[in-house]
């Protein structure tokens, strides 16, 4: 099984690309945000635990997120591997993910990072706000903060993965199809 991390700042298109890449390479797209919401909506034991934590305004602990991902991996059959979107968010989470994968005879094979010019990110987010009606994508100050937070949080993970030879920057400029081709070219070397 092959496992990819996909990263990119807000507006980089990682969600759009993840869906297409997962389909092309028969990977299970694991979006932790979607998984958290689904567990809570389904009222599972894990969902109840997370709902209680979140209702107090606290972050879901790493071990709970890892438990949720491990459950998904353990119950996924017929997939060539996994595409992690939105996780890990810290070096500690990266280490926990590696440990959990190692226990299953797997590893992180590559960290794909979409690189997009700042002005293009802002343009994409504003355009997305027009379509989605998300007010936070219309406010330039909020956009700037989201991009800054991404850089601050992701840089240590990039450095960690780079030291392990896993970091692969990918040009995220151009059309959706152009970016998809570039990502696919990197991934097909490992799948």
Question: Where are the regions a protein language model picked out?
Answer:
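Glycine-rich phosphate-binding loop of ATP-dependent small-molecule kinases
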Residues: 1-191
């Amino acid at each position: 099984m092959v496992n990819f991390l996909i990263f990119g700042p807000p507006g980089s298109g990682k969600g759009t690309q993840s869906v297409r890449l997962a389909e092309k390479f028969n990977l299970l797209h694991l979006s932790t945000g979607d998984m958290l919401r689904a567990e809570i909506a389904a009222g599972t034991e894990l969902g109840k635990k997370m709902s209680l934590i979140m209702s107090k305004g606290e972050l879901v602990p790493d071990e709970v997120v890892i438990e949720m991902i491990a459950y998904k991996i353990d119950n996924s059959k017929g997939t060539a591997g996994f595409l992690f979107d939105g996780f890990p968010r810290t070096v500690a989470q990266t280490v926990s993910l590696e440990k959990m994968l190692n226990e299953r005879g797997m590893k992180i094979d590559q960290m794909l990072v979409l690189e997009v010019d700042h002005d293009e990110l802002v343009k994409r987010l504003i355009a997305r706000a027009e379509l989605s009606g998300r007010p936070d994508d219309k406010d330039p100050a909020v956009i700037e903060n989201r991009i800054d937070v991404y850089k601050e949080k992701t840089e240590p993970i990039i450095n960690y993965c780079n030291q392990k030879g896993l970091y692969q920057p990918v040009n995220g400029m151009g059309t959706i199809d152009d970016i998809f081709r570039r990502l696919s070219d990197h991934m097909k070397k490992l799948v």
